[in-house]
């Protein structure tokens, strides 16, 4: 389908891994390389109003080819890959006509197994694009990028009626900064879709409310032989804090609409320790209760410490559940579902156990649910995408554009 696979393989060859804890946006130079490449390709394709902001947001417009009061709609993907696993020297493997069983990932013992990933049983006969076991693949979200670019080429090269189509490619989505510098007014769409989901048919308009919790613990270190009544072990305090967090409310023990506390990192010495938690919950009241719980735990563990020793806790909200904003505009979901059915796909409405740029954009005035890409197992060496799933995503994007074009005629 019009260079879809070629585009995808080109995009994943560029290392665009984002980096947390960096002030600049984009956080890495590699993202600029892909953004500049996309800008050049959009220009060659003949799109208009192409802009690349100093914060790395690339926008462009495909003009309408029909007249009428047709709403401008948008499609958005992010160019960065997760900091959780290496995105350098990605070496994709193409497995045609998958026949079942384990897939060897490169040379070594790493495999992609249907025992661990049962979804493979549903993908027999399809073309799978996997890693070589040493890096992530980057389908999150370069599959989405390739699908949007291919859909633009299809719309540009065929007499398919459509209104004005806006596209945007953002940086640093994986570290939560991409949408913060997105100019909704400049973008000019009435609504949009992020193309950043998973398996074929996924349509997501609910996501976690999310917050980060950073805990700093200052203890007091002395020689262990003379420590009685003097030493305050920051690591022991950290262990006590985590022991108070409900163990059955962690990512590895929850699913569906269940929220969790996630200890993402912990480091330290006797003298000083740091902990970083992520709090997620779909329900806003439960979300606020989880934040209060963390404050109560810190207060309890820190009670009675020497004045020079303390526990400092900082909570920062990351994003909120976009459901409340998207459901105000039901036609956005109706069009996406109809487009999928027209492409012989059964829509699967499911919550995002995470977040997307669309969550932040929805609260900035741009309602923005999430479409599938055909990818699986993001952020690690077992990541893969199906070519057929990517082709389906292109078809759905094109059909959404066509259905929206008919609304104003």
Curated annotation (Swiss-Prot):
Binding-site positions, Zn(2+) 2: 140, 174, 379
GO molecular function list: metallopeptidase activity; tripeptide aminopeptidase activity; zinc ion binding
A Pfam family recorded for this sequence: Peptidase_M20
GO cellular component terms, semicolon-separated: cytosol
Gene3D superfamilies recorded: 3.30.70.360, Zn peptidases (3.40.630.10)
Catalytic activity, as annotated: Release of the N-terminal residue from a tripeptide
Keyword tRNA processing: no
EC number: 3.4.11.4
Subcellular location: Cytoplasm
This protein's UniProt keywords: Aminopeptidase, Cytoplasm, Hydrolase, Metal-binding, Metalloprotease, Protease, Zinc
Free-text cofactor note: Binds 2 Zn(2+) ions per subunit.
Cofactor(s) it depends on: Zn(2+)
Enzyme class: hydrolase
Main location: cytoplasm
Its biological purpose: Cleaves the N-terminal amino acid of tripeptides.
Protein name: Peptidase T
């Amino acid at each position: 389908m019009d260079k879809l696979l070629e585009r995808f393989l080109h995009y994943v060859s560029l290392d665009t891994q984002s980096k947390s804890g960096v002030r600049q946006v984009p956080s890495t130079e590699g993202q600029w390389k892909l953004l500049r490449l996309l800008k050049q390709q959009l220009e060659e394709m003949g799109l208009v109003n192409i802009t690349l902001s100093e914060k790395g947001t690339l926008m462009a417009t495909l003009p309408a080819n029909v007249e009428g009061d047709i709403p401008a709609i948008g499609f958005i993907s992010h160019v960065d890959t997760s900091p959780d696993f290496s995105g350098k020297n990605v070496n994709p493997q193409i497995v045609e006509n998958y026949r079942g069983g384990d897939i060897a990932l490169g040379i070594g013992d790493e495999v992609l197994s249907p025992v661990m990933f049962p979804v493979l049983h549903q993908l027999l006969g399809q073309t799978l694009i996997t890693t070589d076991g040493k890096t992530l693949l980057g389908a999150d979200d370069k599959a989405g990028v390739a699908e949007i670019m291919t859909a633009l080429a299809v719309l540009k090269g065929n007499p398919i009626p459509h209104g004005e189509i806006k596209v945007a490619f953002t940086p640093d989505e994986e570290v939560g900064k991409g949408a913060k510098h997105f100019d909704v007014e400049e973008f000019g769409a009435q609504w949009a879709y992020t193309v950043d989901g998973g398996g074929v048919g996924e349509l997501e308009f609910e996501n976690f409310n999310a917050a980060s919790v950073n805990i700093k613990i200052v203890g007091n270190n002395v020689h262990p032989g003379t420590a009685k009544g003097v030493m305050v072990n920051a690591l022991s305090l950290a262990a006590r804090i985590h022991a108070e967090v409900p163990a059955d409310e962690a990512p590895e023990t929850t699913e569906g609409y269940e929220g969790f506390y996630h200890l993402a990192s912990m480091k330290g010495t006797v003298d000083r320790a740091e902990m970083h938690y992520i709090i997620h919950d779909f329900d806003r009241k439960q979300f606020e209760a989880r934040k209060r719980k963390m404050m109560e735990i810190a207060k309890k563990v820190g009670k009675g410490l020497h004045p020079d020793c303390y526990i400092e806790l900082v909570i920062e909200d990351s994003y909120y559940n976009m459901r409340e904003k998207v459901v105000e505009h039901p036609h956005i979901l109706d069009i996406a579902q109809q487009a999928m059915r027209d492409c012989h796909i059964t829509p699967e409405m499911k919550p995002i156990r995470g977040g997307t740029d669309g969550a932040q954009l929805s609260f900035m005035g741009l309602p923005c649910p999430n479409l599938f890409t055909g990818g699986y197992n993001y952020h690690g060496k077992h990541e893969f995408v199906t070519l057929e799933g990517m082709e389906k995503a292109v078809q759905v994007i094109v059909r959404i554009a066509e259905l929206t074009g008919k609304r104003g005629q």
